[in-house]
């Protein structure tokens, strides 16, 4: 997780696309899951008077040493969702709707000593509109166990039994 530690006197904003952060950028509210691969974050702070800090740039490179690929993890999730009736097939067709569910793994997180892929669920409408469903899943990269993922009061991801 990417974390910052500051007093409440400051607001922090960040970008991940290489642009300079401003007050209109992503607000830092909770720890950010570590993106897979190479990423560049730019952070800026504003005090109560609106005075900005210098931009801090941080580069991260996360490569997981695991035989579980991202594609295999998503297939495992889809198979479980088919079993419980949430989707009808590996294309993600939702029962009774024309929309489909799509899944994406862009980051990983750690709980205790275990490392998990973080899977975000999207709903894709027939017109191509894609929106987050609010559901998150986690797959342990060492054991291949599937969990539901949620955040606690401090913004850290936690895993819960997948049912």
Annotate the PLM regions.
Residues 25-27, 71, 75, 145, ...:
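...the same signal can extend to comparable exposed beta-sheet modules
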Residues 1-68:
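Short, compositionally stereotyped local motifs that mark structural "simplifiers"
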Residues 131-163:
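A short, surface-exposed interaction/processing loop segment used at functional sites
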Residues 4-6, 121-124, 150-155:
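Secondary-structure transition/turn motif
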Residues 20-27, 86-94, 127-128:
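Acidic Ser/Thr/Pro-rich low-complexity disordered segments
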Residues 11-14, 42-44, 57, 108, ...:
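Ordered hydrophobic segments in well-structured contexts
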Residues 65-108:
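Short, non-transmembrane alpha-helical segments in secretory-pathway proteins
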Residues 94-142:
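Exposed beta-strand-loop-beta-strand "reactive/processing" segments of non-cytosolic proteins
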């Amino acid at each position: 997780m990417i974390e910052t530690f500051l007093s409440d006197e400051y607001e922090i904003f960040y970008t991940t696309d290489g642009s300079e952060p401003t007050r209109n950028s992503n607000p830092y509210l909770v720890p950010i899951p570590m993106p897979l691969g190479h990423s560049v974050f730019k952070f800026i702070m504003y005090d109560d008077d609106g005075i900005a800090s210098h931009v801090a740039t941080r580069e991260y490179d996360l490569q997981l040493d695991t035989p579980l690929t991202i594609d295999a993890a998503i297939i495992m999730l889809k198979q479980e969702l088919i079993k419980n009736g949430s989707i009808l097939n590996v294309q993600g067709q939702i029962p009774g709707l024309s929309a489909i569910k799509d899944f994406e793994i862009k980051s990983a997180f750690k709980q205790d000593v275990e490392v998990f892929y973080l899977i975000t669920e999207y709903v894709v409408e027939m017109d191509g509109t894609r929106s987050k469903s609010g559901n998150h899943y986690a797959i342990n990269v060492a054991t291949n166990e599937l969990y539901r993922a949620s955040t606690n009061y401090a913004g850290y991801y936690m895993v819960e039994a997948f049912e």
